[in-house]
Amino acid sequence: MTAPENLDAALRPKTLTEYVGQEKLKDKLGVYLQAARGRREALDHTLLFGPPGLGKTTLAHIIAYELGVNIRVTSGPAIEKPGDLAAILTNSLEEGDVLFIDEIHRLGRVAEEHLYPAMEDFKLDIVLGQGPAARTIELPLPRFTLVGATTRPGLITAPMRSRFGIIEHLEYYTAEEIATNLLRDARLLGFGLDEEAGLEIGARSRGTMRIAKRLLRRVRDYADVAGETTIGLERAQSALDKLGLDSAGLDDRDKKYLETLIHRFAGGPVGVDTLATAISEDALTLEDVYEPYLIQLGFIKRTPRGRVATAHAYDHLGLPPGGIDDGNGIFLN
């Protein structure tokens, strides 16, 4: 059997041409890659940021493939000490290779400081011994490209940010872009997917390719059990409804967020910590998981005084703007 992560890797586009969406970023990245190839140089260090599941890891692999080099994948939490970093830089990289660090904002501070000369001068300072007898030796490194990915760019320190020559933001995908990608996946996996069904899955995927691919697998499960070799619109709608996703892609947790904000806090403003406590979540989860998509839909606003529900949120939940149904047909402000 093929594990989902191996399946995702097999379906991952290898080139910028195969990659669907992020058109502005692709245009710029295409120029940078062509220039680097023409000069036979490593690509400038690149920082990719945006919500989870938008393709930062995929783009890192595409960069390596387009440059014809190897990629070494690690994550910020895995690099706690300078020794962890030294092992990666000295044992795993060859000239021009790509080092991809996911969640780079979680890189240990001491390790981060040792990364600066590696990024800037392609050298690594190693301290041998302790106390007065300690001495520093300088190890030359191959010229490599660091690709960092983060969902929290505000946590990237200024010294680290300044060492990236390319900094790009990934946007949410349209339903059409997601459908195009899902149709490709279905073709590669050998089952049918109607375009309307692809659009339906795309519309309920929170603009996120990773979620769309997960939903496609679940919808396919329902189709397989029903003995269907092609996923049509009705099957997609039925399966997605059973998965608890509404027409905008909101699940029960998203609705709980909005309903708590509206019913318990009169639509806001309310602080994120208070709201998190009310729905038994932590504030970081709200900020990283729930809120980006709700803001994208125009359902909430972040204000200096706290979170506020918009008229679109009331409308989506079937409530008149600014009012709350008390259960007796009376709307309270």
Curated annotation (Swiss-Prot):
Catalytic activity line of the entry: ATP + H2O = ADP + phosphate + H(+)
Region (Head domain (RuvB-H)): 247-333
Top-level enzyme category: hydrolase
Location (main, coarse): cytoplasm
Keywords: ATP-binding, Cytoplasm, DNA damage, DNA recombination, DNA repair, DNA-binding, Hydrolase, Nucleotide-binding
Residue span of region Small ATPAse domain (RuvB-S): 174-244
Binding, DNA: R302, R307
Residues binding ATP: L11, R12, G53, K56, T57, T58, E120, D121, F122, R163, Y173, R210
Top-rank lineage group of the source organism: Bacteria
Entry keyword DNA damage: yes
Any one GO molecular-function label of the UniProt entry: ATP hydrolysis activity
Residues reported to bind Mg(2+): T57
Annotated stretches, region: Large ATPase domain (RuvB-L): 1-173
Statement: the UniProt record of this protein carries the keyword Nucleotide-binding: yes
UniProt domain comment: Has 3 domains, the large (RuvB-L) and small ATPase (RuvB-S) domains and the C-terminal head (RuvB-H) domain. The head domain binds DNA, while the ATPase domains jointly bind ATP, ADP or are empty depending on the state of the subunit in the translocation cycle. During a single DNA translocation step the structure of each domain remains the same, but their relative positions change.
Entries under PANTHER family matching the protein: HOLLIDAY JUNCTION BRANCH MIGRATION COMPLEX SUBUNIT RUVB, PTHR42848
Protein's job: The RuvA-RuvB-RuvC complex processes Holliday junction (HJ) DNA during genetic recombination and DNA repair, while the RuvA-RuvB complex plays an important role in the rescue of blocked DNA replication forks via replication fork reversal (RFR). RuvA specifically binds to HJ cruciform DNA, conferring on it an open structure. The RuvB hexamer acts as an ATP-dependent pump, pulling dsDNA into and through the RuvAB complex. RuvB forms 2 homohexamers on either side of HJ DNA bound by 1 or 2 RuvA tetramers; 4 subunits per hexamer contact DNA at a time.
Family to which this protein belongs: Belongs to the RuvB family.
Protein name: Holliday junction branch migration complex subunit RuvB
Organism: Deinococcus radiodurans (strain ATCC 13939 / DSM 20539 / JCM 16871 / CCUG 27074 / LMG 4051 / NBRC 15346 / NCIMB 9279 / VKM B-1422 / R1)
Gene: ruvB
